[in-house]
């Protein structure tokens, strides 16, 4: 009998020991079979649940709007969706409500509006999408009401002729909504719009208990840094990863989870549909059942694109039903080079304002390039510099290059890391020389090899004193530019202008002169007078711009003066704001300067 018992024990022990599951693949591909799959939308019942979940069907007597605006002590991070009980008015009313909601969904999804649950509608509902409820205002818009969305849809998506309008800052601080400071966040699934952070530097953290099981921690953090940087490049917001402050002091917390996760009131539904959701002014959660991938991966869901979308929600943006918008609710596969488009930029700037700031130097860099066919062409690009950073401005697109700013020492080899005071390109039939000025010194730049010259033609080393080679001029300068029309360099210092004749290598006989004399104001009293930040001859506009602070003055062109001969030579037109002419030249936090998109 004892022997039999021992045999049974051995068999049971063997069964227990061999029940351990073995994983063989380093890429965890053998785990995918255990991932929970989201419920498919297959019939009118599942379609009705979908429409209810995302706000197309409202529960009878629902008190959602009152809850979302409450100033009481409800803990929104822990509460369930609460609805006041009510009575139904019968199946016919329910059917009509379903058809109406279905038609709304079809309109917003650019489907034929039939009110019928057809295959196209089914496919649209089964697409991966954000878990944030669709904005009430968006749903009202489909019935024809006047709103912001109508403005967005009718506005042109080309950027060339846009004049920036003053931002409408409709802000309400959450301290007025929630008494408990640790609960100062809102669920964007009940987004009501026109609310924003009241500060411009925001802290974020990928929480330790919320790492993804599919990507390395380094990959996750790189993607989130890049996603935050993309919003920073188009708004006055700056983001910094904070690993040390108490968690309640972190503005935006990110994490991955499945099903019931991270103490959240919402459940994830598994792979295949809802990939993430966000809480206004607070948290972003990603469904770790989804197959998230790094940029430049052909399959799966781009974590970068999803992160940019969800950060948009946290910052205050609702879903936007417009082709090209990063805020569309459904995931649309895009190429690896997707960016935040013009209208999404304007949407975030309506909440936070536009980027402003003074520049130390602005110039067009001209150089010769050889085409693949062996032809030599002359090209130029516009650059803005300040505080040791530079932006390349794409005039044809009216925006900065994606991924800017960049540190000066990275892109302009050999220049002072803090930037420069002035740029001059002497370009005529006999001379093609680029100079940068800083303090009392100047450097000559080799545009062909993209670095400063180490030696002058006479063998002396660069940098050299400005006064040595530009007699009558000494640093530090405010700014300078070369005017091809009269072959003079215009040096600006205080209220004076020094005109330097490059052919004769000396100052013009009338120099120095007062800036108000050389560049008279067309509108009386409208003049920078002294201490310019930058003077810049633009080959795009074929004229000179003078910049000071947040303002600029355009110098009357020769063509304009020929049409209106009564106007003074070099007259300054009425000032305008820099951000009205050159859009989205925005700073990023110093910690994200090296975060660039990998190719």
Curated annotation (Swiss-Prot):
Q: Name one GO biological process term.
A: proteolysis
Q: Where are the annotated glycans?
A: 398
Signal peptide coordinates: 1-20
Return the SUPFAM superfamilies for the record.
Hemopexin-like domain, Metalloproteases ('zincins'), catalytic domain, PGBD-like
Where is the catalytic site? Answer: 310
Q: Which InterPro entries match?
A: Hemopexin-like_dom_sf, Hemopexin-like_repeat, M10A_MMP, MetalloPept_cat_dom_sf, Pept_M10_metallopeptidase, Pept_M10A, Peptidase_Metallo, Peptidoglycan-bd-like
Pfam families, per the entry:
Hemopexin (PF00045), Peptidase_M10 (PF00413), PG_binding_1 (PF01471)
Q: Which CDD domains match?
A: ZnMc_MMP
What's the Enzyme Commission number for this chain? 3.4.24.-
Give the molecular function GO annotations.
metalloendopeptidase activity; zinc ion binding
Which portions of the chain have biased composition (kind: Polar residues)?
A: 143-159
Annotated positions binding Zn(2+): 130, 309, 313, 319
Q: Per the record, which residues fall in region Disordered?
A: 141-170
Keyword set, alphabetical order:
Calcium, Disulfide bond, Glycoprotein, Hydrolase, Metal-binding, Metalloprotease, Protease, Repeat, Signal, Zinc
Q: Which cysteines are joined by disulfide bonds?
A: 355-586
Propeptide part(s) removed at maturation, as residue ranges? 21-170
Q: Which domain of life is it from?
A: Eukaryota
Which of the seven top EC classes does this enzyme belong to? hydrolase
Coiled-coil residues: none
Please describe the post-translational modifications of this protein.
The precursor is cleaved by a furin endopeptidase.
Report the gene knockout effect: Morpholino knockdown of the protein results in randomnized heart looping at 48 hours post-fertilization.
Q: Which GO terms describe its cellular component?
A: extracellular matrix
Family membership noted in the UniProt record: Belongs to the peptidase M10A family.
Role played: Plays a specialized role in the generation of left-right asymmetry during embryogenesis. May act as a negative regulator of the NOTCH-signaling pathway.
Record protein name field: Matrix metallopeptidase-21
């Amino acid at each position: 009998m004892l022997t039999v018992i021992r045999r049974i024990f051995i068999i049971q022990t063997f069964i227990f020991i061999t029940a351990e599951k073995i994983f063989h693949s380093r890429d965890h591909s053998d785990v995918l079979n255990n991932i929970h799959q989201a419920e498919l939308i297959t019939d009118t019942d599942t379609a009705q649940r979908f429409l209810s979940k995302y706000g197309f069907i409202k529960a009878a007597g629902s008190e959602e709007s009152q809850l979302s605006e409450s100033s009481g002590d409800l803990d929104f991070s822990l509460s369930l969706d609460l609805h006041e009980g009510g009575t139904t008015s019968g199946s016919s009313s329910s059917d009509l409500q379903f058809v109406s909601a279905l038609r709304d969904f079809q309109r917003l999804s650019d489907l034929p509006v039939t009110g019928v649950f057809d295959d196209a509608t089914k496919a649209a509902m089964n697409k991966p999408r954000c878990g944030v409820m669709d904005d009430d205002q968006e749903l009202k818009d489909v019935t024809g009401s006047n709103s912001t969305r109508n403005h967005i849809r009718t506005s042109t998506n080309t950027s060339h002729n846009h004049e920036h309008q003053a931002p409408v800052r409709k802000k309400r601080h959450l301290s007025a909504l929630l008494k408990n400071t640790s609960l100062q966040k809102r669920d964007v699934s009940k987004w009501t719009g026109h609310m924003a952070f009241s500060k411009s530097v925001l802290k974020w953290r990928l929480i330790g208990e919320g790492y993804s099981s599919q990507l390395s921690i380094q990959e996750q953090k790189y993607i989130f840094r890049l996603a935050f940087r993309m919003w920073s490049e188009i708004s006055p917001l700056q983001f910094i990863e904070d690993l040390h402050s108490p968690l309640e002091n972190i503005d935006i917390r990110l994490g991955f989870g499945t099903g019931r996760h991270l103490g959240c009131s919402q459940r994830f539904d598994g792979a295949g549909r809802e990939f993430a959701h966000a809480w206004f002014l607070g948290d972003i959660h990603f469904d770790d059942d989804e197959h998230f991938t790094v940029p430049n991966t052909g399959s799966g869901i781009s974590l970068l694109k999803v992160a940019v979308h969800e950060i948009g929600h946290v910052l205050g943006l609702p879903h936007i039903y417009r082709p090209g918008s990063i805020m569309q609710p459904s995931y649309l596969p895009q190429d690896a080079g997707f960016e935040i488009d013009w209208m999404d930029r304007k949407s975030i700037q309506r909440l936070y304002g536009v980027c402003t700031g003074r520049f130390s130097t602005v110039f067009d860099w001209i150089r010769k390039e050889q085409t693949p066919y062996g032809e030599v062409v002359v090209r130029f690009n516009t650059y803005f510099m300040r505080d040791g950073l530079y932006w390349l401005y794409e005039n044809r697109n009216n925006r900065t290059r994606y991924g800017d700013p960049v540190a000066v020492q990275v892109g302009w080899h050999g220049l002072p890391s803090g930037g420069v005071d002035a740029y001059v390109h002497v370009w005529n039939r006999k001379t093609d020389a680029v100079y940068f000025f800083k303090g009392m010194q100047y450097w000559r730049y080799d545009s062909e090899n993209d670095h400063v010259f180490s030696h002058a033609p006479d063998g002396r080393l660069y940098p050299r004193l400005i006064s040595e080679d530009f007699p009558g001029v000494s640093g530090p300068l405010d700014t300078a530019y070369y005017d091809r029309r009269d072959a003079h360099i215009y040096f600006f210092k205080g209220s004076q202008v020094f005109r330097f004749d490059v052919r004769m290598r000396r100052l013009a006989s009338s120099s120095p002169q007062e800036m108000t004399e050389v560049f008279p104001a067309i509108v009386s009293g409208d003049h920078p007078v002294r201490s310019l930040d930058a003077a810049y001859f633009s080959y795009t506009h074929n004229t000179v711009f003078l910049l000071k602070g947040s303002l600029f003055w355009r110098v009357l062109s020769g063509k304009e003066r020929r049409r209106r001969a009564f106007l003074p030579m070099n007259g300054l037109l009425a000032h305008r704001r820099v951000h009205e002419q050159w859009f989205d030249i925005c700073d990023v936090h110093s910690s994200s300067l090296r975060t660039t998109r990998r190719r």
